[in-house]
Amino acid sequence: MATIAELKAVLKDTLEKRGALRQIKARIRAEVFNALDDQSEPRPPLCHENLLINELIREYLEFNKYKYSASVLTAEAGQPEVPLDRQFLVKELNIVEDANGKSVPLLYGIISHFLHRGKEESTQSTLPKVSLLSYPRQNLAKPSTERNQKDRIPEPGRMAGTSIEEPLVLQSIKR
């Protein structure tokens, strides 16, 4: 007859081989986070750029089946429960997708574009080089369409947004 220690070892090994142990641990971490999250303390509103960045990350996490990581990101960042529409993201980020690129997260296409840009010497979609020191703090009270370029420096702890003059053309990638 097997000992309790042997049964534990076999159970752990089986769960690891199936990938279930990793899922169980992630689920426990997400549940602990949700239990400890203080809902009474209001979160500061997300700036437009952080909302878009978080949405790109959420799309990536959900595509890769990191659902507990995505739920923690949504809760911790104060992201809306309902994901933003992909077409909205494409329009806001001034991205042009080819038909094959729609099957993977936008983040894959963005990364692929910049990894291969040097090889193809495209003048399209070059991010402007901006010195953050020369701009005042961002005016978050205005919608992003009303902010001018000098309002682009973020508050401490927030990411700076960049604007793309030409559309970012994403082509299909092999994953």
From Swiss-Prot:
Comp. bias (Basic and acidic residues): 144-155
GO cellular component, one term: cytoplasm
Start and end residues of each LisH domain: 49-81
Pfam families associated with the record: FOP_dimer (PF09398)
Lineage: Eukaryota, Metazoa, Chordata, Craniata, Vertebrata
Described purpose of this protein according to its UniProt entry: Involved in the biogenesis of cilia. Required for the recruitment of PLK1 to centrosomes and S phase progression.
Subunit structure: Homooligomer; probably required for localization to centrosomes.
One Gene Ontology biological process: microtubule anchoring
UniProt keyword annotation of Cytoplasm present: yes
Location, primary (coarse class): other
Location of region: Necessary and sufficient for homooligomerization and localization to centrosomes and pericentriolar satellites: 1-104
Keyword Cytoplasm: yes
Family: Belongs to the CEP43 family.
Record key words, sorted: Cell projection, Cilium biogenesis/degradation, Cytoplasm, Cytoskeleton
Protein name: Centrosomal protein 20
Region spans: Disordered: 137-166
SMART domains assigned: LisH
PROSITE patterns: LISH
Subcellular localization(s) per the UniProt record: Cell projection, Cilium; Cytoplasm, Cytoskeleton, Cilium basal body; Cytoplasm, Cytoskeleton, Microtubule organizing center, Centrosome; Cytoplasmic granule
